[in-house]
Structures are given as structure tokens and as C-alpha cells.
Amino acid sequence: MIPAQDITGLILAGGRGSRMGGVDKGLQTFNGMPLALHTLTRLQMGGGVGQIMINANRNLAAYESFGASVWPDGLADYAGPLAGFLTGLEHCETPFLVTVPCDTPRLPLDLVPRLAAALEAENADIAMVAAPEIGKDGQVRLRPQPVFCLLRVELLESLVRFTQEGGRKIDAWTALHKTAVAPFDLPHDDPLAFFNANTLAELHQLENNPA
């Protein structure tokens, strides 16, 4: 098993928050606490990381008050979560980086160990979450959740090259590397663990649906 001190957690809070009316999503309140602080607390409680960073592009002092180092995108114009991956890898001082978005306050406490186990089992470069999702046909299928990733820091050079060539899609980049999948469909897994609140209405819906 990969020791916790070899893994840095990265909370992705650098988006525009367009579907929330342009607000800074990570600072929106969920059950009395900012979303990003919920995420940080869950990572700490899980014990799978040695340190935590936050990727944010505004209100940096507010994020710094959570006690983590904060780094803005190196790419311009809110280039998306892959820009956050790049920022995290550039500043990561451990062999592995795990990425999580700021808007999933119910992420599993065992997220990091399960990603690490999947990566080691397949000797992969990347491990990615797959979570159950109900399709339009009513069938439940496992769907990749590419913003929940465990990455080897040696991938930095590859990501620099990919973004310099104009690449911005996570799945297009991860497809270039051996990627393991960690399914989160066990009976005890929270079905809303990876539900990301894109609108204020969805955030309130999640608040009213306790785990």
C-alpha cells in the first residue's frame, strides 16, 4: 500500500462557477461550512494523504484560511480541471497526487486507499473513480469520474506537453496513460458520495438528503 505521506491531496476549486451564477463554488455554504472546507476535512479524516493543497483562482486568502497552501492556475482563462491537475503536479512534493473537486462534500473517507490499491494492483500511472449512475433508460451503470484521480507525479512532463498543444479534456489526456479504475459500488458505499452540486438548487437538495 502507498503510504499516506507519499500522497498529496489537491482540492480543485478554480472554476468559474458558471452554473451557480458565477459565484466561487468552493466557498458556498453546505450545512454551515464552506464546500471546500468539507472536502478538505473529509480528506483529512480519511487519513490517506500527507498534505493538502487547494487550486483556486480567486478569493485566495479565504482558501488559505483553511490551513492549506493555495495555488492558482498557471494556464489563463479558467482552463478547466486539467489546468488544476497541472498546477497540482507542478507544486506536488510527493510521488503521488490525488485530485478531488470542491463540490462533493460527501466524498468517501476511504477514497484515497481504494484509488491507491487500484493503481498498485495494475501498476498503472493513473487510478480513476467509477461510480454508479442511473442512465436515461433507468439502468444503473458505472461511470468514470475523471476529476477523482490518483496520479504519479512523473506525468507532469506529459501534461505540460498536452496542454501546450491545446489539450484541455481530462479523458483525452488520461487515455494516453495506463489507467486503473476503482469502482465505488459496494453495498455500503454512499450513492451520493460523488454527486457534485453544480447549482444552488442541487446544493440545497444534497443538504436535505442526509447520508
Swiss-Prot record:
Annotated gene: mobA
Name of the protein this chain belongs to: Molybdenum cofactor guanylyltransferase
HAMAP family linked: MobA
Keywords per UniProt: Cytoplasm, GTP-binding, Magnesium, Metal-binding, Molybdenum cofactor biosynthesis, Nucleotide-binding, Transferase
Coiled-coil ranges per UniProt: none
Pfam families: NTP_transf_3
Catalysed transformations (reactions): Mo-molybdopterin + GTP + H(+) = Mo-molybdopterin guanine dinucleotide + diphosphate
Family (UniProt): Belongs to the MobA family.
Cofactors that this protein relies on: Mg(2+)
Quaternary structure note: Monomer.
NCBIfam families recorded: molyb_mobA (TIGR02665)
Function summary: Transfers a GMP moiety from GTP to Mo-molybdopterin (Mo-MPT) cofactor (Moco or molybdenum cofactor) to form Mo-molybdopterin guanine dinucleotide (Mo-MGD) cofactor.
Residues the record lists as binding Mg(2+): 103
